Amino acid sequence: MAALSCLLDSVRRDIKKVDRELRQLRCIDELSARCLCDLYMHPYCCCDLHPYPYCLCYSKRSRSCGLCDLYPCCLCDVKLYCLRPSLRSLERKAIRAIEDEKRELAKLRRTTNRILASSCCSSNILGSVNVCGFEPDQVKVRVKDGKVCVSAERENRYDCLGSKKYSYMNICKEFSLPPCVDEKDVTYSYGLGSCVKIESPCYPCTSPCNPCNPCNPCSPCSPCNPCNPCSPCSPCSPCNPCDPCNPCYPCGSRFSCRKMIL
C-alpha cells in the first residue's frame, strides 16, 4: 500500500506539472492571437520596429486602435511603446543572459585551471592543459625526451542545403619535465572542466638533489672534516722547517748537534 500511495503521489505531481505547462501554452497562444496595435503602436506608426505603415485594426475589427484616443502621436517617438516587453526584447535579454553565463563559465574554468597549475607544491600535478571542445578519445598525450606533448584534433561536419561543410579544430601544448621525474612514471587523467592533468608519483622538486643533503662539487669531502690544502698537517703538531732538531735538545745548548750525531 505504501508503494501504491507513493506512485499515486508521483502521478498527481506529473499531472499538475502538465496542467501548468498547458496553461502557459494557452496564455502564449492568446497573446499571439491578439492584435499588437492595441498594445504597442499608434495606428499610423512608421518606425523600424513595426513592419506596417498603418494600423491593421481597421481591416480586422470595426473599432480603431485603443491607443488612438489616448496618444495623438506615435509612442515610439517618446520611447513609451514598451508598455509590456515584446517577444523581440525578451529574445535579446535571453541571448544576453546566455552570453553572460558562457563568459562566467569560461572565467571559472580558467580560474580552476590556474589553481590546479599552481598547486604543484601540495600535490603531484606537474601541469594541466585545457582541452575544452574535445572528447576524451580525441586527446593524445606523448612523453618523449623529457618532454610532455598534449595534442587534440577533431573534425566538424555541417549539412547545409544538400552540401556538406567540414571544419577542423586542433590544439598542441608541450612542456618539459623536472629533472627528478622519470618518463615512465608520468601519468595523465581527463578531469572535470575538460582539463588534462599530467601527474607523477613523486613530488616535483626544483633541484635535482635532495635539498636537505645537496651535492656540492666544490667540497667533495664531508663538511664536518673538509680537506684544507693550506694546512695538510695537524694544527696541534705543525712541522717547523726552522727547528729540524729535537725540541728537547735544541741547537746552542750544552750538547751540540755534532755530539748528538756521534
Curated annotation (Swiss-Prot):
Keywords: Cell projection, Cilium, Cytoplasm, Cytoskeleton, Developmental protein, Differentiation, Flagellum, Phosphoprotein, Repeat, Spermatogenesis. Signal peptide: none annotated. Residues 34-77 are annotated as: 2 X 5 AA repeats of [RC]-C-L-C-D. Residues 209-250 are annotated as: C-X-P repeat region. SUPFAM superfamilies: HSP20-like chaperones (SSF49764). It is found in: Cell projection, Cilium, Flagellum; Cytoplasm, Cytoskeleton; Cytoplasm, Cytoskeleton, Microtubule organizing center, Centrosome. GO terms for cellular component: centrosome; cytoplasm; manchette; outer dense fiber; sperm flagellum. The modification Phosphoserine is found at S5, S10, S64, S86, S122, S123, S151, S167, S189, S194. Testis. One of its GO terms (biological process) is cell differentiation. The keyword Repeat applies. Sequence repeats lie at residues 34-38, 73-77. The C-terminal contains many C-X-P repeats. Interacts (via leucine zipper motif) with TCP11. Interacts with SPAG4. Interacts with KLC3. Interacts with CCDC42. Component of the outer dense fibers (ODF) of spermatozoa. ODF are filamentous structures located on the outside of the axoneme in the midpiece and principal piece of the mammalian sperm tail and may help to maintain the passive elastic structures and elastic recoil of the sperm tail. This is Outer dense fiber protein 1. It comes from Bos taurus (Bovine).
